[in-house]
């Protein structure tokens, strides 16, 4: 509390005085930072390679990389999603893998997220420790990207996600198309 007193006088010799007490209240603290949803990337267009990062996905991930470069203390979380049909395939493959050690188990949601992270790290130069991968429970062939500012907690802001053990899922290596044999080119040109 602060006491304030005012005294005034005019040119005719009149005076006046007033006093008051003012309570100064501290302003409320700023709201805690929250996780921001950035974009949703669809992987439904390529039926043969449903976890591949295509050019459309790269455009979205380029924006994510720019956001991370603008906010050096922020992190990103990439949440891969899969369809019910893909989850059924994974469950079936896991049963086979329990009996056969060399059996392959496709984890579509984790693979999508890991491929998106790999693009951010290898192509855009984002530090791998700033990008986390998780899987979600939404039905779809998508990846949801989130920006987590310093002081925010992803797990409390976004429910229904599970962190991915990146040692159990491998990044899908991009393979260039095989070069066509010259005889095939001539046959195609002759038609």
Give, region by region, the residue ranges found by the protein language model.
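Cysteine-centered nucleophilic/redox motifs
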Residues: 78, 109-121
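Trihelical helix-turn-helix/Myb-like DNA-binding core that engages the DNA major groove
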Residues: 117-120, 127, 131
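A beta-strand-dominated structural motif
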Residues: 109, 133-135
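Periplasmic peptidoglycan-binding/tethering modules of Gram-negative envelope proteins
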Residues: 1-76, 89-98, 126-129, 136-191
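Short, conserved glycine- and acidic-residue-centered signature motifs
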Residues: 54-57, 105-109, 113
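Short acidic, S/G/P-rich loop/turn micro-motifs used as interaction or catalytic elements
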Residues: 83-88
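Short helix-coil junctions and helix-kink-helix linkers
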Residues: 95-107
